[in-house]
Amino acid sequence: IIEMFLFNDIYNKDKEHFPEFAKEYTRRLIKKKMENPDLKVYVLSDENNNLYGAFEHPFITDMKNAGIDVIMVDIFKLKDTFPWYSPIWRTLIAPHGNPQGKGWIGNFYGPMWPKLTLRNLLRALNVKADHRKIFLNEENVVVSSANIHDPSYFHENVAISANGEITKDVLHGLQLVAEFSDGKIDVTEKQENKINFYMNILITIVFYQINSKSQSFFLL
């Protein structure tokens, strides 16, 4: 189970270039799922990865097509960041929907990304997000400051790994997030207690600094 704030490669590729970290991560998740069709893989994603409804990011589409359960976290059930704006948005703007693929406003991330509608932008102005970065398997949990995000590739990050009873608490929290987002993380007690079940899916992110630049590695 992965809960991830930034899971994308969205930036102006005409002006900058970063390693294709998010693409490679997506490829490896899909590869692992294809190798083990019965393996349950869940990705909880923040709406900013779809530019607040302007489109569905190809990484998300590819994961869904591979049988990975992608749950878009319903950030609009969270407490209002701007209580002077969100009630107005909910009353006057949200009822009109959030069109996808009908943009006419140039994308500030560059021309390689879909154009935006005014309603996409007004939706983003609620400034709500799921900032958590959690990786969980049957025995271990990793909580990190790192995003699966190309422009963040060289950032310095920290992470903590734990096992034992705490993993059940983390799982319960992830299940609650999925439930209020109209999704479901279907993990039974029997599955929780399996020993060495697909231990290769443990996602470990290690950050270290070389010549003042942090390098990101992951193991699937």
What label would you give each PLM region?
Residues 1-220:
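Charged, low-complexity intrinsically disordered terminal segments
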